[in-house]
Swiss-Prot record:
<dbReference type="InterPro" id="IPR017981">
    <property type="entry name" value="GPCR_2-like_7TM"/>
</dbReference>
<feature type="topological domain" description="Extracellular">
    <location>
        <begin position="477"/>
        <end position="499"/>
    </location>
</feature>
<feature type="transmembrane region" description="Helical; Name=4">
    <location>
        <begin position="456"/>
        <end position="476"/>
    </location>
</feature>
<dbReference type="InterPro" id="IPR046338">
    <property type="entry name" value="GAIN_dom_sf"/>
</dbReference>
<dbReference type="GO" id="GO:0004930">
    <property type="term" value="F:G protein-coupled receptor activity"/>
</dbReference>
<keyword id="KW-0807">Transducer</keyword>
<feature type="topological domain" description="Extracellular">
    <location>
        <begin position="566"/>
        <end position="570"/>
    </location>
</feature>
<feature type="disulfide bond">
    <location>
        <begin position="292"/>
        <end position="321"/>
    </location>
</feature>
<feature type="transmembrane region" description="Helical; Name=5">
    <location>
        <begin position="500"/>
        <end position="520"/>
    </location>
</feature>
<feature type="disulfide bond">
    <location>
        <begin position="81"/>
        <end position="94"/>
    </location>
</feature>
<feature type="glycosylation site" description="N-linked (GlcNAc...) asparagine">
    <location>
        <position position="129"/>
    </location>
</feature>
<keyword id="KW-0812">Transmembrane</keyword>
<dbReference type="Pfam" id="PF07645">
    <property type="entry name" value="EGF_CA"/>
</dbReference>
<feature type="disulfide bond">
    <location>
        <begin position="55"/>
        <end position="75"/>
    </location>
</feature>
<feature type="glycosylation site" description="N-linked (GlcNAc...) asparagine">
    <location>
        <position position="203"/>
    </location>
</feature>
<feature type="disulfide bond">
    <location>
        <begin position="38"/>
        <end position="47"/>
    </location>
</feature>
<keyword id="KW-0472">Membrane</keyword>
Length: 689
């Protein structure tokens, strides 16, 4: 019963609730039926009187008819500027827009009506029918600010600057003259230029030597020169239009934009610079660098450039610049990046690590050069890599911050570019040689292969980097050296002339490394177990890992700095990348010298001989000078003597090191199988000796 009552109550509630719902649905259906009487209209058309479609205002079907009769008809834009009936006054510039049009003119200043031909100055008095409502800004800079992109602003400003200069010089017969124009928000002065002439506009001055500066354009007479100051244009053409390839933290405009122009049919070339004294807009910052720039217009728009201009002097009130051409000028105040705690710590690690690497690279190079028993193709590669890294690190420590003069900085940047590219090229040759050696362990005539490699490794190791640097210098020599460091500029991707080859070599060496590990694993597993048990597993593993860094593969860690990772991860990667790579010289000395058994024995013999010589000197102080000289002599034979390093009674086969793996067996414990294994290993000894 209770369930039945509940069900009955629910039904009644649903019935009562459905009454207004049904009324609402019925109303909606009625509205839909009414509107359904009008067909679906095409783009730029609307339903009229619920019966047919018509084109919106500013559109027609192409037959001077707005009503759409056939379903396939489309509404097209009306070009009001081409109609027989004039819509703009004679002095106005008519511009067609989609669905409308604009009449542009300068009402209060007819002399500057040409400005309306560059930018849209929408005013009711420009229309034949004054009732047209425009609502647009009439101020020139206000119109420029309505452009959507920087490129559009730059293009409009470039046209404006050129037109203003041309109009003031060529369409203004009243010279000399000093005037202002509120529409353009400018002040200007024109003079007849024959000798040294000083012009002033808006607390800015320009000093030009017309006698020497415009000889080719004067033709013995006077010429007109103009100096224009734009009060508000700097709000648009600000520091963001400066191509900041130098990596400044902030670049701001700190003067009015000024223009210097001469009446001439051709662009004048000045033999003497023009001196510009520009008033500072804001107080100067002691950390900032002041850049004298000019506006360099182009088809893409334009930008601020320092070409042809240099900074002379700056105080709290004004800045003096000198330029060897006439254009539009300004002063930019550029703040360098402040070195935070992380960068400071990384700098300390870099300088300490590179200093230690220099010492190790020097010792390694001396070892590879003077130790005759270990000299082969491998040590030749080690020697060239050590020399390149030593010179590159030394130049980095002493010259990376020598940004003045610019020419010296560019030379240092070019030399660093070459030396580091050469270092990477020798790393590539190291990896290639190691891979070929391991791949041909069964080749008996290995020495001929080594001589063949020497024929091309010097041209590749030194010639190919020279070619890359030469092409880069020809294509963009201005990109060598920046305001902050003597290195490659980031402008237009010039840094890829180094990063491209380096990344390719890192990838190739990484492939070589894993192939070598795979080949060695299969080779070692086939050797006699007694041979393999003689190896020091810890040293072998350590040297195999270090070999990865010696080949430059660790530089690939730097890629993680540029990808989207967490701040903590990026910080860890930055420290890891810096520590590993600045210590590359230490790792080279460690793996190829200190952990090389033969080199260690040579070091011991050398120190033993040196100690004996010192002891001999102390006991023979009273001897003759001739005997003393003989005691002090330490020739190359004594440093690394050629001969057997072991006692004949306990001789072993020459030790072999393959990517950190030593293979050697005493003769007294070798069977025929062991001899084959030892001989097999003997031919692979040059891998990392």
């Amino acid at each position: 019963m209770l369930m039945g009552a509940t069900r009955d109550m629910g039904s009644r509630c649903l019935l009562h609730a459905s009454v207004p719902g049904m009324l609402l649905i019925w109303s909606i259906l009625q509205m839909m039926n009414i509107s359904a009487s009008c067909p679906q209209c095409n783009e730029n058309a609307s339903c009229f009187n619920s019966t047919h479609c018509v084109c919106k205002e500013g559109f027609w079907t192409g037959s001077e008819n707005r009503r759409i009769i056939e379903p396939h008809e489309k509404c097209q834009d009306i070009n009001e500027c081409l109609l027989k009936e004039l819509v703009c006054k004679d002095v106005s510039y008519c511009r067609n827009k989609i669905g409308t049009y604009i009449c542009s003119c300068v009402v209060k200043y007819p002399l500057f009506n040409w400005v309306a031909g560059i930018i849209n100055i929408d005013h009711p008095d420009c229309y034949v029918n004054k009732s047209k409502n425009t609502g647009s800004k009439t101020h020139t800079l206000g119109v420029l600010s309505e452009f959507k992109s920087k490129e559009e602003v730059a293009k409009g400003a470039t046209k404006l600057l050129r037109k203003v200069e041309h109009h003031i010089l060529n369409e203004n017969s009243d010279i000399p003259k000093k005037d202002e124009n509120p529409l353009l928000d400018i002040v200007y002065e024109t003079k007849r230029c024959k000798t040294m002439t000083l012009l002033e506009a808006g607390n800015n001055t320009m000093k030009v030597d017309c006698t020497s500066g415009f000889k080719e354009h004067n033709s013995g007479g006077e010429t007109a020169v103009a100096f224009i100051a734009y009060k508000s244009l700097g709000n648009l053409l600000n520091g963001s239009f400066f191509s900041n390839e130098e990596g400044f933290q902030e670049v701001t405009l700190n003067s009015h934009i000024v223009s210097g122009a001469i009446r001439s049919e051709v662009k004048p070339v000045l033999s003497e610079p023009v001196l510009l004294t520009l008033q500072n807009i804001q107080p100067i910052d002691s950390r900032a660098e002041h850049l004298c720039v000019h506006w360099e217009g182009s088809e893409e728009g334009g930008s601020w450039s320092t070409k042809g201009c240099s900074h002379v002097y700056t105080n709290n009130s004004y800045t003096i610049c000198k330029c060897f051409h006439l254009s539009s000028f300004a002063v930019l105040m550029a703040l360098p990046h402040e070195e935070d705690g992380v960068l400071s710590a990384l700098s300390v690690i870099t300088y300490v690590g590179l200093s230690l690497s220099l010492l190790c690279l020097f010792l390694a190079a001396i070892t590879f050069l003077l130790c005759r028993p270990i000299q082969n193709t491998s040590t030749t590669l080690h020697l060239q890599l050590s020399i390149c890294l030593f010179l590159a690190d030394l130049l980095f420590l002493t010259g990376i911050n020598r940004t003045k003069p610019k020419v010296l900085c560019s030379i240092i940047a070019g030399m660093l570019h070459y030396l580091y590219l050469a270092s990477f090229m020798w790393m590539f040759l190291e990896g290639l040689h190691l891979f070929l050696t391991v791949s041909n362990l069964k080749v008996a005539n290995y020495s001929n292969s080594g001589r063949f490699k020497k024929r091309f490794m010097y041209p590749v190791g030194y010639g190919l980097p020279a070619f890359i640097v030469a092409v880069s210098a020809i294509a963009g020599h201005k990109n060598y050296g920046t305001h902050n460091h003597c290195w490659l500029s980031l402008h237009r991707g010039f840094i890829w002339s180094f990063l491209g080859p380096a990344a390719a070599i890192i990838l190739i060496n990484l492939v070589f490394y894993f192939l070598i590990i795979w080949i060695l694993r299969s080779k070692l597993s086939s050797l006699n177990k007694e041979v393999s048990t003689l190896q020091d597993t810890k040293v072998m593993t350590f040297k195999a890992i270090v070999q990865l860094f010696v080949l430059g593969c660790s530089w690939g860690i730097g890629l993680f700095i540029f990808i989207e990772v967490g701040k903590t991860v990026r910080l860890i990667v930055a420290y890891l990348f810096t520590i590993i790579n600045v210590l590359q010289g230490v790792l080279i000395f460690m793996v190829h010298c200190l952990l090389n058994r033969q080199v260690r024995m040579e070091y011991k013999k050398w120190f033993h001989r040196l100690r004996k010589e010192v002891e001999s000197e102390s006991t023979e102080v009273s001897h003759s000078t001739t005997h003393t000289k003989m005691g002090l002599s330490l020739n190359l034979e004594n440093f690394c003597p050629t001969g057997n390093l072991h006692d004949p009674s306990d001789s072993i086969l020459p030790s072999t090191e393959v990517a950190g793996v030593y293979l050697s067996t005493p003769r007294s414990h070798m069977g025929a199988e062991d001899v084959n294994s030892g001989t097999h290993a003997y031919w692979s000894r040059t891998i990392s000796d």
